[in-house]
Amino acid sequence: SKVDYFSSICYNVLGLIKIFERRGILRVKCFHLGAYGTNCFLAYDENNIAYFFDCGGHNLDKVYEFISEYNLDLKYIVLTHGHGDHIEGLNDLASHYPEAKVYIGEEDKDFLYNSELSLSDAIFGEFFKFKGEIHTVKEGDMVGDFKVIDTPGHTIGSKSFYYEKDKILISGDTLFRRSYGRYDLPTGSLEMLCHSLKKLSKLPDETVVYNGHTDNTTIGEERRFLERVGIL
């Protein structure tokens, strides 16, 4: 069933926070949100300009507290794709920060209004519909200082976001640690996913990969993995 896929990545860590610290211009914090513990990332620069990537649950109190404590200016709410475990808390977050703009890949926009695409009913038992304004992005666009990389396959509109100055990649459910996203859900494609993985493998080896459901990794590590399994 549809929900079987998501149960396979459920960490049962509802409400817990895991912090990843990196030296450099950008700092990245990981919050595990929703029933599946989706990795949702708060990134902020030296000027306290902040980005929030994916919003997998309603348990946002720790997010609000952190943003307030560090006096961050949340300007960008960014979705790597439109599956329910990445959008469940979107209405809550967007209403709490009405000045922040919400971004998603243009091909995945319909996921925010169609539960058959987002699988939100199977994931968290609700028919999700986004209530705010959405901004769509495509290959080569910039969201603040992050460059949009078109990485379809898990969904047709999956995007990754690359912060070149610090070599940080937000990969959503396209590339995991020693794994990659499923391609047999609505709009998914193995051919497109393989193309996307090959594209990401061309980034610098030292690029740190923050993904939707596993520990962070690097492009160099995952290039070697993809070579071993025959994708590269």
Predicted segment positions?
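Short, positively charged and aromatic/hydrophobic N-terminal segments
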Residues: 5, 11-12, 18
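Short acidic-hydrophobic surface loop/beta-edge motif
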Residues: 20-21, 31, 43, 139-144
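Short Gly/Pro-enriched turn/cap motifs at secondary-structure boundaries
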Residues: 31-32, 132-134, 150-152
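Residue-level marker for buried hydrophobic side chains located in beta-strands
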Residues: 51, 78, 102, 147, ...
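Metallo-beta-lactamase
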Residues: 58, 119-120, 148-150, 155-232
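Active-site HxH/HxHxD metal-binding segment of metal-dependent hydrolases
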Residues: 58-60, 65-143, 224-228
